Structures are given as C-alpha cells and as structure tokens.
Amino acid sequence: MSRIAKRFAKLKAENRAALVTFITAGDPDHATSQALLDGMPAAGADIIELGMPFTDPMADGPAIQLAAGRALAAGGSLRQTLEMVEAFRKTDAETPIILMGYYNPVYAWGAEKFAADAAKAGVDGLIIVDLPPEEADELVPFLRQAGIDFIVLTTPTSDDARLPVVLANASGFVYYVSIAGITGTASAAQSAIDEAVARIRRHTGLPVCVGFGIKDPAQAAEVARVADGAVVGSAIVSVLADNIGKPGAVSAPLALVKDLAAGVRGARN
C-alpha cells in the first residue's frame, strides 16, 4: 500500500479529512524552505505538496508566482527540490509528499529518469498542471513503474462526459480545483463544492481533495466536512512572504498550518 493510500485509510478510520499543505520548494531560500517542509507534519499537515519552481507558473496567482521567482533567484531547481524530499525522508518516513508543477522541467529531465529519481528521493505523487489527460500516457507508465501516484486535476467545467477521460490515469487522490481561475484568488460557494465532490465520487472511488481559494481555518473546515481533503497553498506562502528576514519566517506559516489543522480536525465533530 502506498504512503498516500495508507494516510487516507488512517484518516478514514479517524473520520476526518486531510489537511494538504503547499509550499514552493526553495522559497525564499533552501534552508528556510527545508525548515518549513520539515516542520509541517508536527504542525498538522497530513499530506504535503511541494511546488517545483518554474519560470512561467501560469495557473498560479501572484503569491505562488512570486514564491517561484524567489526560489529561482535563490538557486532553486528540480534537483534541489528532490534533494529537499530526500532530506525530509531522513526524519519522516510516513507523511506523503507530492510534487506539483509544470511539465517542462520534467520533460527536460526525461520522464523515465525523473520518475525513477523522484521515487528514489521519496516522492509519493505528482501533479502536472499543464499536461492534458490525452497526453499523460507519455509519463504515467514510468510513474506507475516507479510507484508514484499520478494525481489529476478536475475543475468546475469537468462534467460527467469529461470526467472519465480526466480520471483514466488517476491514482492516489483526485484534486478538485474549486474555481475556474488561478490559485489564491476567489473562493467557490460551498454548495458548488458539495455538488462537485458528489459528481466526482460517482466516477471514482479515489479520495477527493479540494483546493484553490481556501484561505483560513473556517473555510478549510467547511471543505473538510464534505471532501476527503482540504488543500491550502497561497495563504501559507503569503504568510511566509510577509515574514522573510524576520525571526518568524518559519514559525508564522507553521502557526497558520496549526490553525488550519485544528479547523480540519474539528470539522466533522
């Protein structure tokens, strides 16, 4: 059983959703980013998404675009991202880590080699924002071979006709993008999220996590009542950005993670 499957089985037994946190690898620098990553599980993150810094993060809003810029300026790279996962695994063998980003760096690395190297580093899943389902076959077989889950994105426009195509190669969990837009901007109405989660569940037995637009513990709790996971990224990245160069550079975002975790854990009580 994969680390992701084990984590969701554990959460199901506890009758609660996952808090899935996102940070950009190498933001604002390697050491700070590593400390933040390493501190996430103790603060309450159940699953961690680590953004692969890229020059043109088109699906991301201002907060994550700026984070990618800071990471790249500080020498961030795909190699460094894998090294961060490797370092994390020295102290944590249980928390799933998912790499999230764009296909270009993976393609340049070589799909087969990337899958093998990512698995060796301790990566559990991969989300590629700009790889259409119709083209995923050039990557998915190598991920399967390496034991890495391919996590697909579904959106408000993924209807019953489209979902089987989108979900064809899915494993690990399904990520529902709750707004038709970029990360960290507007928030979707809870009723629309409820309907979308129900629709996706008609097509798959995989857990469904909801992200884009979740900014605080109350919103995370709302989502966690219905979905199998609440994904928070821009809010954490923004708090980190506000504290760069201060003593609270790591402790402030981890305090937010702790509050988000409390919201998610109390959602179904």
UniProtKB/Swiss-Prot annotation:
One cellular-component annotation, GO: cytosol
Active site (record annotation): E49 (proton acceptor), D60 (proton acceptor)
CDD domains xref list: Tryptophan_synthase_alpha
Gene Ontology molecular function, alphabetical: tryptophan synthase activity
Pfam name, any one: Trp_syntA
Record EC number: 4.2.1.20
Pathway(s) per entry: Amino-acid biosynthesis; L-tryptophan biosynthesis; L-tryptophan from chorismate: step 5/5
Catalytic activity entry: (1S,2R)-1-C-(indol-3-yl)glycerol 3-phosphate + L-serine = D-glyceraldehyde 3-phosphate + L-tryptophan + H2O
Keywords in alphabetical order: Amino-acid biosynthesis, Aromatic amino acid biosynthesis, Lyase, Tryptophan biosynthesis
Top-level enzyme category: lyase
S-S bonds: none
Entry coiled-coil feature ranges: none
Family, similarity comment: Belongs to the TrpA family.
HAMAP family xref list: Trp_synth_alpha
PANTHER family reported for this sequence: TRYPTOPHAN SYNTHASE ALPHA CHAIN, CHLOROPLASTIC, TRYPTOPHAN SYNTHASE, ALPHA CHAIN
Entry function: The alpha subunit is responsible for the aldol cleavage of indoleglycerol phosphate to indole and glyceraldehyde 3-phosphate.
Subunit record text: Tetramer of two alpha and two beta chains.
Name the UniProt record assigns to this protein: Tryptophan synthase alpha chain
Protein's organism: Paramagnetospirillum magneticum (strain ATCC 700264 / AMB-1) (Magnetospirillum magneticum)
Lineage, opening ranks: Bacteria, Pseudomonadati, Pseudomonadota, Alphaproteobacteria, Rhodospirillales
